[in-house]
């Protein structure tokens, strides 16, 4: 084929970005988690709008494309969110949104069971899909469950369950 009929890359059009992956699991969120998603959407939207309004926006198409992609992902997450009312959760067993204090041979720890996008190990906020949360879900105070970890199974006892407002976490 003649090279005359082949479009040469001109460098002006950015490569199309792959979409950010969306989870196949239900998008359960705590009230705090939904507020965080909405705040992140607003901040990203404001950054995108400011970039579009700037005189240099033509030279920053890659950054604009990244922001647009993130906004599509955030929009999907906000619209698919299933907000869980923590006060309506059964207070006597571990369910989504619970703050659970556990004791083990490694000491006492407190974890909050949250949605996928809220999980933050450094804050002891674990996804409801994690092995720890799966071990705890349904447990009552005094129950001992086995947390299956890569480092080895650990027996943990539930010593407290709390669904108090998590804004102080």
Q: What are the residue ranges of the model-derived segments?
A:
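Short, intrinsically disordered, mixed-charge
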Residues: 43-46, 80, 134-141
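Amphipathic alpha-helical dimerization/oligomerization modules
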Residues: 155, 159-168
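Active-site phosphate-binding and catalytic loops of NTP-dependent enzymes
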Residues: 79-90
